[in-house]
Amino acid sequence: MKSLVKTAKGPGNIEVRESPVPKIPKDDWVLIKVMAAGVCGTDLHIWHDQFPYWPPVILGHEFAGEIAEVGSAVRRYKPSDRVVSEPHSKSCGVCHLCRQGIVQLCKEKRSPGWGMDGGFAEYVTMPEMLLHRIPDGMSYDIAALAEPMAIAVHHVTERSKIECQDFVLVTGAGPIGIMAAFVAKAAGAAKVVITGLDSCEAVRFPAARKLGADVVVNVQKEDACAIVMDMTDGKGADVVIETSGSQNAISQSIRMARVCGRVCVIGIPGPDETPVPWKAAVQKSLVMEFCMSSGYTAWDKALSLMAGANKDLSSLITHVEPLENWEYLFGELTAERGIKGLFLPKE
């Protein structure tokens, strides 16, 4: 089968290879025929050697497909079922986090695409416990957005707990930021403002508007803080969702939140340590949530939300390519000339 492989440590070292179709490793696992697979920022970081991985490994953890084969202990799924999968494979199941259902943060976890072979291939294996059915009528392309959408749902609704009539600010107009704006609006936010850069003007800002952002702000041309304060009569945002990882955006998130507001941090900064206006956060009595990945409940909610917005979400998919065009697609997404790129491994 065709596959996109990170062959060795170091920048680059990615190539399309012929790999054997994987065998089901355990009785409660399934073999999935991959129909569409999304490119994540993590894949780009692995390309540049900026994220942990165990080569040689097939990349990709955002995928949708059809079950080709099931293990003898699989009970809820059968061949031909359409599924997506959470990426939290190889969690230990016995640590204090796993026992609380927080398998995504288990230290033993080795997700597809970096810790085990992933979905940038014609086939991938996953455990039954991580599967979710694709709703009837939803295309594989849209279903491949489930993983980042689940992250947005988990952080925006389950952690930030957005309430009806909240004023929500999203910093960063990347895929997660745009999805966070979409989820916030669906959760009842009265106003959603999203910030971005010059590079967002052509594609990302129009998609954000289409998916629910009331106002877009180019921070290279406008003063986001002044705009937010003007729109809220000087109070600030009820909820700030920080998705960019930018040092300036992290600082501004605290300054633009209202007293007793909520700040949800999703974006991961480059440096290990990032200065923040801690005094301002304390004086405002802010609630700050630091979030990583997503859980089972968020996936169910995300798929339900996506099923009701199937057509709207197509604006997020700006590139669709075969695996052979990986370098072009990675370059386009790195340059922010798109939002979500998909591979169709069978083409």
Regions found by a protein language model. Name each.
Residues V203-P206, D214, Q247-G308, P345-E347:
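Glycine-rich phosphate-binding loop and adjacent beta-alpha segment
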